[in-house]
Amino acid sequence: MAAAGRLEDSSLDILQSMDDDPLLDTQPLPHHSLQAQFRPRFHPLPTVIIANLLLLIHVVFVVLAFLTGVPCLYPNPTEDKCPENYTSPLKVQTAIILGKLILWILHLLFERYVQYHHRKVRSRGYSQIYRSTRHLKTLALTIHSSGNTALLLLLCVQHSFPEPSKLYLELILAVLALELICSLSCLILYIVKIRRFNRAKPLPDVLEEEKIYAYPSNTASETGFRTVSSLEEIVEKQEDIIVYLKRHNALLSKRLLELATQPART
């Protein structure tokens, strides 16, 4: 009987302490408000427009290079200049090389721009699109850098062996054409991937995996099964998840404090 009395007294003390707790006096937050505040907002990647513009600039440059260089391949060019002097006072090769340098700088700026936005997407929890375009978003710049190396090699050889001048111009135009084909393939593939990502408007990878595990259809049932193939990918994926969860928890804490102070303001 004494033990039962002590148990009843302790339960009454707990209930009284809960009633006296000021944190529990606040009104419960409405479910629809929490759902609206904590639902992750999708931010599309804005790199598609810049990629399309750069693709157009590249095509225009190569077309102008051919329109300027092909007349110089006709018989009797005067001192490696076109008869019409399209690029006067510069030589044709000089104008093409300068245009190629400007195009490379644009690709360098584009690569930095893409890296910046992809890092932001990765911090929001979309590590899958970051990994799937890791090499693709830098491949166009690598192709242009390789083209610059080939052009530099041609200019060095031409400096030592100036004749025949037509052959070097033909090789320069061939390098530009090959570079255009490879670069366009990379940019088009990148644009298609990013457009699909923007149209799909997926949830962060953590929430997408929760949906898959909540409604398993074709997933393997073995314990410890992972779809990634290497330990490095597993560690990188876990790192991305931890960074996203830390950022998400900080955002949730901030919004909870804002919602909790709203009844007091009113």
Curated annotation (Swiss-Prot):
Its membrane topology: Multi-pass membrane protein
Query: Mind listing the GO molecular function terms for this protein?
Result: protein homodimerization activity
Location within or outside the cell: Lysosome membrane; Late endosome
Q: Which UniProt keywords apply?
A: Endosome, Lysosome, Membrane, Phosphoprotein, Transmembrane, Transmembrane helix
For this protein, the record's Pfam families field holds: TMEM192
Which parts of the sequence carry Phosphotyrosine? Answer: Y213
Listed GO CC annotations: late endosome; lysosomal membrane; lysosome; nucleoplasm; perinuclear region of cytoplasm
**Which InterPro entries has this protein been placed in?**
TMEM192
Name listed for the protein in its UniProt record: Transmembrane protein 192
Organism, by scientific name, is Mus musculus
Per the record, the gene is Tmem192
